[in-house]
Amino acid sequence: MVVGVAGYYGFRNAGDEAILEAIARELQARGHEVVALSGDPKRTREDHGLRAYHRLNPLALLRADLWLLGGGGLLQDATSALSLTYYLSVLRLARLFRKRVVVFNQSLGPLSPWGERRVRKALQGVPVILRDQDSLEYARRLGIPAALGADPALLLPPPPVPREADLVIPRAGVQEEALTTLYVAANHLVHEGKQVLVLLLQPGYDDEVAEVFRLHRIERTSDPRRLLYLAAQAGYVISMRL
């Protein structure tokens, strides 16, 4: 079977790329061919070895027998109502093309009242698997049948490596107060003789953090394999959602 995966792929976000890597590995291990919708199909082909099509090409939905929407946090309109419109349109169009669709290990929300109505309508008759208990309870309140799964990135095997750094700080959307606290904590650990690695996970979006931590060791990566390698080396990890 050809299985398509639609999500926030091709934008060099390490968390989303880890999700795609994990989903593709599991499906391929079961004998399925995997294709992906991507904001940068060339990069997705190079990074993951998958057939990839531009996410704005509706005819790409004809290239798979089944489409998985996810994982990640796609079903929300707190950051953008346009983003929610896009993902719900992918679901509707795939069904119009008579393709099977599954909402796969997503989180759900936050949603505006208008967004709740749109999601409830779009998911009628669609199998829904959610990655956390809060999302599952939210779905039940909305009257959306759903099952509990987990974040696909947890399926990626950690590499066997010796530990080197004592702290890894992935960052996404850090507020000023939290950033100051992290900086103080990092300096304290350095004074204790620890090695500190500041890991920036979406190149181009972390300039503020790079400036604050400019005296520390910094690495920028959107490669999930590199992220796993560095995290496996760490004695401690301080992290936020990606």
What does each model-identified segment do?
Residues M1-L242:
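Active-site anion-handling motifs in enzyme catalytic cores
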